[in-house]
């Protein structure tokens, strides 16, 4: 009875010279062809192509030993042969693939591949992972024009900021940047780097910087474009109403936790008269919003402070400040458009109010009339 066995043959092609210089190890049962000679070898999963034996047809019965003839002279050189071909169907001395399929060990390999739906890429990846990728790679350089994807398993990746990561670059003995992303295009479909997490339950930062050097931990420099526009050096947007869009915490001795310096982009003094070092805009919800009740500036000291709560200076001179007790100082005459109510008009540090003066004048008039 004849049994039909589904066959999937994995093979590689190179010239005889390329095979001789190649360190590729064929999988057990994988075929390697010499495209210029038409000969082939069967891989054993251990040796390179040059160490394997050529494939031959079925061995026939041993014939009678004949008499050794005389060695003939060297004949004339024959004409050049036809150009070789890489078309398998046109190769000479082709192995009998049907004979290979009838071998018990070959059938076992093919059945295993069919059961796991293995394809060419899967077989290559498996071979590389078991043979090549177990070795330490020493790359001296190269260019990849396609996409590289890393999908590591859970095991083997350390959660360390120095030796962990699916990709780890150690620059301890090198110069220059560990990673450079560059483009010279006018437009593109995406940014140079994207960090994304789709899960609300993800409990790690999208980016973490651990630094203790002598310069800034993060530098962002935006050059002046040929035509100034409304783009920003840093744009932060948060849709999480339970947290702040940005939190800053520092341990400064004589500096501000947040330092803002505005520089006039022009030599003319009034060129930037409409600019501000700090600008705050409070708006309602963009779609269907009816208003907002948010505060413009909120200052608080949860543990209490002996310093000024607000201090405004010009040319290093105090012009206005609010002390820790709420008292304020103004360095010049001030105009109040509305009413100014003084809670303690008799205080020696406050001027008398109009109501207070009118009341006392009325009392004085009554005393004069009685006399």
From Swiss-Prot:
Q: Where is the composition biased (Gly residues)?
A: 69-78
Catalytic activity as recorded in UniProt: Random hydrolysis of (1->4)-linkages between N-acetyl-beta-D-glucosamine and D-glucuronate residues in hyaluronate
Keywords carried by this UniProt record: Degradation of host capsule during virus entry, Degradation of host cell envelope components during virus entry, Glycosidase, Hydrolase, Virion, Virus entry into host cell
Looking up Pfam families in the UniProt record yields: Hyaluronidase_1, Mtd_N
Tell me which EC number(s) this protein carries. Answer: 3.2.1.35
GO cellular-component terms in the record? virion component
Q: Which gene encodes it?
A: HYLP1
GO MF, one example: hyalurononglucosaminidase activity
Can you tell which superkingdom this protein's organism belongs to?
Viruses
- Tell me its family: Belongs to the glycosyl hydrolase 69 family.
Major location (coarse): virion
Organism of this sequence: Streptococcus pyogenes phage H4489A
GO BP: any one term: symbiont entry into host cell via disruption of host cell envelope
Q: Where in the cell is it found?
A: Virion
Protein's job: The hyaluronidase of this bacteriophage mediates the penetration of the hyaluronic capsule of Streptococcus pyogenes.
Query: Which InterPro entries does UniProt cross-reference here?
Result: Hyaluronidase_bac, Mtd_N
Q: Where is this region: Disordered?
A: 54-88
The protein, known as: Hyaluronoglucosaminidase
